[in-house]
Amino acid sequence: MLDFNKIEPEEGKLDLDLRCVNYDLDDKSHLRYGDWVTFKSHSSKKVRISRPESPRGENSDRQPQDADYPSLSYELESEILARFPRWEYWKLSLVNKRCSMLLKSGEIFEIRKENGFKEPSVYMLASGETNWWTFDREFKSRRKIPDLPSDVCFTFGDKESLCAGTHLLVSGREIDGLVIWRFELATNCWYKGPSMVNPRCLFASATCGTSVFVAGGVGIMANSEVYDTAEKYNPDSRSWDLLPRMKRKRKLCSGCYMDKKFYVIGGRNENGELTCGEFFDEGRNKWELIPDMLKDDPVLTCHSPPLIAVVNNELYSLEASSNQLKLYMKKTNTWKMLGQVPVRADSNRGWGIAFKSLGNELLVIGAASSSASYSGNSMAIYTCCPDPDVIELQWKPLDSGRNRLSSFILNCSVMVA
């Protein structure tokens, strides 16, 4: 009889020593070596439990050691480890060489993708820091990722960040020009490139699954014109592909992915501020203009790009001048006020604020409002499940200022893998 004393079902949790396995088995008591096990997942994989081979042909009843589980096939072991919380994956390199290679090759993330496992984490660069930090979803744990090996110009210059699958892309300027540095979660290392077809800054971006879209922006030359070009990044090939040109040239714009379309909103060009938006329909391979999408937004001098995020396929905006959260009404092309957020977006005209989607919640990070419990200059972190029908939204504070990082956020991206 197969011993499952160390394999107990527990939803959503798997300890590294394999004492907890997220099986969906109806009856473990009748399983024997040679039986097939079906995982109730998107891929409904079926694997065989094999009996370990005893040394010198002996029929040993010894228990497997801490990091040695010969009774599990490689396929079954991989399926189990894929259910392990992604935040703890760094421990795999301490188990054995095969587990380490499962992580570094990226195979474990492919298994997670096939089975529909998704877990968000937040990557952030705060003012006064030269290192990026990554946080788990609840901001209960954080880790400093390796130093980005660029030059001083890139380190202290303006940067833009975006996530595509398990890649964190950071765009900025080195002494020789615009570059992109790529952090790969699997290897925990930085790599240079690939550069965009049209290198740019001050652009809009949005993530869709494992791909990322960029549009608009401007080059770094003094006489560079504002772009109407767009591109799509494929993390599998580590390459950029050109998309059709937008209807309007724009820089300092914002992007999001909603209704299976890439939206680009606001910004400015040679003629001034833009209140229109537009979206790219990948199925039709064309852009459509949305006039007056931001017509009621007050125009501030030197303001940030629009602060927008999509949760449950609904578009939300944080108005920098009033700290008001707004919901976009698709049918009427108008915005509905939902109340104030607990951070000060108005203190720096929207700059230094992180406003992101985090699963089915909104995430906002910045300087706390006067009514908040945070003190000093440490960042305030809040999440909220937005509901257009409630009178007052309930914002949940996270971290309680323990991290002591600056409240001015230079870059922030959410990785879902």
Question: Language-model segments: which ranges?
Answer:
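CRL adaptor-proximal regions
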Residues: M1-S71
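Skp1-binding F-box subdomain of Cullin-RING ligase substrate receptors
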Residues: D3, H30, R51, E58-R142
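Conserved short beta-strand element of beta-propeller blades
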Residues: P70-S71, E110-S127, S150-S171, I180, ...
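Beta-propeller blade signature
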Residues: T134-R137, V179-T187, Y227-S237, T275-R284, ...
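A structural motif specific to WD40 beta-propellers
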Residues: R143, Y191-G193, D241-L243, E288-I290, ...
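Plant regulatory low-complexity segments
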Residues: L307, T334-W335
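WD40-like beta-propeller blades
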Residues: W335-P342, D389-R402
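Short active-site-adjacent structural elements
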Residues: D346, V364-I365, S371-M379, V390-L393
